[in-house]
């Protein structure tokens, strides 16, 4: 599903030299290298932000230089040895490469900020656009950096005003929406319309409409670039060039169709026509999830309506096949921002638990033929989950959002990385599996109960890691310091932190009993917090130097924070992240 990552992976497997035993190793080398460069860009990002506190020039004093490098070192190493990032760095998956693109894009925009007033500075914006196009073929999470990039541009080019700030938010939404809901879906949509017209209408060969549309799109875009260049329309030239390179990056998805046409052994969804590719790109095999409006989990369908038409490839033309089915529900069981929506039977009990619901409020009682209530073995009244009584309230809906989606599926992972982790057993709310801990006994026992009497396989789990809140505290110090010293940059990092964290929680709208832990989805948010960990070092140095004017201060603070945060994290995480001598057989 990630074609550019697949191409990169194929390139790295060439270094196996035909030895299939080394293919897995070379794929993991790709993740390792991508992760290493991610840390490099994080180091450069932190040092860039610290340099702005002292004025962006080359003549720094020795204490300032040590502060800059020490902050970058501590912040970058803290992220290096964080639980989520370290795990993704040692597996052959897209998330290490995705982290690299996120880090590269954010750093590149800061690089543009330095030279924004120089000739040809827009080449950095075009590079970023190209990376965005490539990232579509790796993971769509990278697009969430766009609002932060828009504000870097706004703060550099325009004086701050309230209206300008609001317009920048609007521009962020428009650009992000244009890529996600115009470029990505509409290019294959229009290609499919041309394909249908050329094949069914003009009796031309298969794929002729797709080829014609792509040639036409490229030709019109190139002409627009040439025309705006001749007319010296710099802004429009940059926009069209950026659009062009986004399409070039997005074109990696053509490899998906090429592989499917070749009928490779692994050919999920068979996307060999533009119509099946369109379904593949829209992730229709995963179904729909309501975002801002939809039915609650105990709603029952009232009718079925026909949805979109799909087409099947025949011998010499495309045939219309059955349309998708769309269920409609009683409006009383629909609501705004539905978080408890999944109608799968096993999820109902979880919604009842997490949102503190009562079955008696949601369902009618089961009754026998005489109309008497049916009781279970323990004498409890049984309720018919196929006979809804009333929908949950909005407050109950939001309780699930905060307790499960925010608390269990985001904050728990955040605390894994910056406070500590109980074990690597997947948990669904149990006090003994997969919770966050701090290592401070009375705080952990207040939440989870006594931890000493647990079985050895839980108590002595390799992933039992304790950081005593030290990374979290240092990051919060850096956050506060950042807003006090340079609120504009702090706002930009906050956007990155929120959009790659809580915003993903809102968009995914996850149901309970997830098949695996999902911390990898929020690696970008943890990356942003690592920036504040680095700035926390700067905050401590500057606070102490107000009283002690000595070069020993930045050296001492760097060494102490290095030992208390990244070294502590490395020592705690090493045993459960070291993959030496781990084999499947």
Regions found by a protein language model. Give the residues of each.
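Short hydrophobic/aromatic helix or loop-helix immediately within or flanking a transmembrane segment
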Residues: 1-21, 32-33, 40
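Aromatic- and kink-enriched transmembrane "portal" helix at the membrane-lumen/periplasm boundary
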Residues: 14-15, 20-28, 53-68, 75-99, ...
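Transmembrane-helix motifs of polytopic, lipid-linked glycan transferases
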Residues: 29-60, 104-108, 473-480
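Membrane-interface transmembrane helices that cradle and orient dolichyl/undecaprenyl
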Residues: 55-58, 62, 66, 105-124, ...
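Short hydrophobic alpha-helices at membrane interfaces in multi-pass membrane enzymes
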Residues: 70-73, 115-133, 162-175
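Perimembrane helix-loop-helix junctions
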Residues: 113-114, 145-177, 181-239, 561-568
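Signature aromatic-anchored transmembrane alpha helix within multi-pass, membrane-resident enzymes
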Residues: 174, 243-247, 483-487, 531, ...
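Hydrophobic/aromatic-rich transmembrane helices and adjacent perimembrane loops
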Residues: 514-538
């Amino acid at each position: 599903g990630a074609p550019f990552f697949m191409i990169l992976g194929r390139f790295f497997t060439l270094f196996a030299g035909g030895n299939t035993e080394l293919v897995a190793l070379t794929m993991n080398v790709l993740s390792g290298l991508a992760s290493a460069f991610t840390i490099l860009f994080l180091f450069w990002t932190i040092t860039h932000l610290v340099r702005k506190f002292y004025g962006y020039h080359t003549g720094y004093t020795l204490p300032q230089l040590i502060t800059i490098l020490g902050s970058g070192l501590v912040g970058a190493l803290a992220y290096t040895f964080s639980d989520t990032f370290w795990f993704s760095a040692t597996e052959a998956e897209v998330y290490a490469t995705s982290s690299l693109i996120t880090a590269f894009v954010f750093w590149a925009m800061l690089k543009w900020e330095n030279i924004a007033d120089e000739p040809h500075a827009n080449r950095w914006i075009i590079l970023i656009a190209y990376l965005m196009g490539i990232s579509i073929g790796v993971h769509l999470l990278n697009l969430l950096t766009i609002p932060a990039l828009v504000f870097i541009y706004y703060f550099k080019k325009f004086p701050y005003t309230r209206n300008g700030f609001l317009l920048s938010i609007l521009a962020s939404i428009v650009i992000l929406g244009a890529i996600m809901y115009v470029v990505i879906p509409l290019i294959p949509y229009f290609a499919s319309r041309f394909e249908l017209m050329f094949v069914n209408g003009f009796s031309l060969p298969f794929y002729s409409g797709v080829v014609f549309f792509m040639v036409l799109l490229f030709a019109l875009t190139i002409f627009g670039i040439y025309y705006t260049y001749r007319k010296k329309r710099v802004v429009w030239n940059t926009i069209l060039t950026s659009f062009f390179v986004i399409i070039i990056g997005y074109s990696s998805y053509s490899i998906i169709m090429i592989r499917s046409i070749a009928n490779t052994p692994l050919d999920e969804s068979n996307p060999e026509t533009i119509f099946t590719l369109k379904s593949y790109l829209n992730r229709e095999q995963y179904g729909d999830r309501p975002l801002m409006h939809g039915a609650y989990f105990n709603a029952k369908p009232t009718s079925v309506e026909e949805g979109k038409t799909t087409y099947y490839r025949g011998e010499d033309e495309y045939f219309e096949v059955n349309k998708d089915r769309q269920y409609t529900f009683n409006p009383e069981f629909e609501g705004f921002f539905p978080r408890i929506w999944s109608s799968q039977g096993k999820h109902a009990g979880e919604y009842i638990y997490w949102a503190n619901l009562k079955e008696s409020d949601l369902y009618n009682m089961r009754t026998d033929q005489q109309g008497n209530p049916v009781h279970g073995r323990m004498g409890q009244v049984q309720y018919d989950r196929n006979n809804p009584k009333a929908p949950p309230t909005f407050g109950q809906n939001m309780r699930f959002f905060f307790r499960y989606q925010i608390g269990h599926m985001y904050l728990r992972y955040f605390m894994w990385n910056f406070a500590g982790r109980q074990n690597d057993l997947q948990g669904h709310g149990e006090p003994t599996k997969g919770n966050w801990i701090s290592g401070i006994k009375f705080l952990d026992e207040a939440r989870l109960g006594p931890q000493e009497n647990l079985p050895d396989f839980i108590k002595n789990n390799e992933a039992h890691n304790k950081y005593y809140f030290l990374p979290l505290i240092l990051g919060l110090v850096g956050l506060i310091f950042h807003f006090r010293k340079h609120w504009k940059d702090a706002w930009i990092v906050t956007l990155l932190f929120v959009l790659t964290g809580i915003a993903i929680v809102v968009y995914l709208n996850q149901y309970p009993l997830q098949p695996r832990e999902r911390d990898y989805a929020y690696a970008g948010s943890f990356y942003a917090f690592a920036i504040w960990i680095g700035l926390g070092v700067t905050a401590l140095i500057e606070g102490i130097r107000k009283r002690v004017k000595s070069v020993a201060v930045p050296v001492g603070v760097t060494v102490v924070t290095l030992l208390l945060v990244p070294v502590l994290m490395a020592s705690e995480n090493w045993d459960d992240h070291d993959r030496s001598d781990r084999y499947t057989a």
